[in-house]
Regions:
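C-terminal segment of classical bacterial N-terminal signal peptides
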Residues: 2-10
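Primarily extracytoplasmic ectodomains and periplasmic/lumenal surface modules that are beta-strand-rich
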Residues: 35, 46-49
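Short acidic, Pro/Gly- and aromatic-enriched capping/linker segments at domain boundaries
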Residues: 9-29
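Beta-strand-rich cores of mature extracytoplasmic or soluble domains
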Residues: 70-135
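Mature extracytoplasmic domains of secretory-pathway proteins
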Residues: 49-82
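A short tyrosine-centered beta-strand micro-motif
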Residues: 37-41
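N-terminal helix-cap/turn-to-beta initiation motif at the start of protein domains
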Residues: 28-36
Length: 135
């Protein structure tokens, strides 16, 4: 597993929090490719683990030229996330957004794996985690 330290911040708004991340590489969300840049990720439904099974994740570039809302699975933890985390998985030469956790939440958003990316011995699967030490 590779860890990637990146600029990660809590995107505060009057209505909902989110995660702001400077992603230094191209990545895929669903069937859309996003260039390297700074993005805001946030749960639109604020789903609860154990109660809800789906959420909708918003991915938006801070420059305003890229946007995607995608249905995700809800994953849970017994403890609140102490800091925001955005996880990417590299497979078949591409990097895919795989999970987003907002600080203070016990539920995260996990994107469904694409069926056309069947794991084989030839595919290298590496997880890149963008996070920061929150004090």
């Amino acid at each position: 597993m590779l860890s990637l330290c990146s600029s990660v911040g809590l995107a505060q708004s009057s209505r909902q929090a989110g995660v702001a991340v400077k992603v230094p590489f191209e990545f895929v969300v669903g069937n859309q490719t996003f260039p390297a840049g700074t993005y805001k990720f946030r749960s639109l439904l604020n789903s609860v683990a154990g109660k809800d099974t789906i959420d909708v994740l918003e991915v938006r570039s801070v420059e305003g030229h890229m946007y995607r809302a995608i249905v995700t699975d809800v994953v849970g933890s017994t403890e609140e996330a102490s800091h925001p985390r955005v996880r990417f998985t590299r497979s078949g030469g591409q990097v895919f957004l795989s999970e987003v956790w907002e600080a203070g939440r016990t539920a995260g958003c996990r994107l469904q794996k694409r069926a056309d990316l069947e794991q084989t011995a030839a595919n290298e699967d590496v997880t890149l985690i963008a996070s920061v030490d929150w004090r």
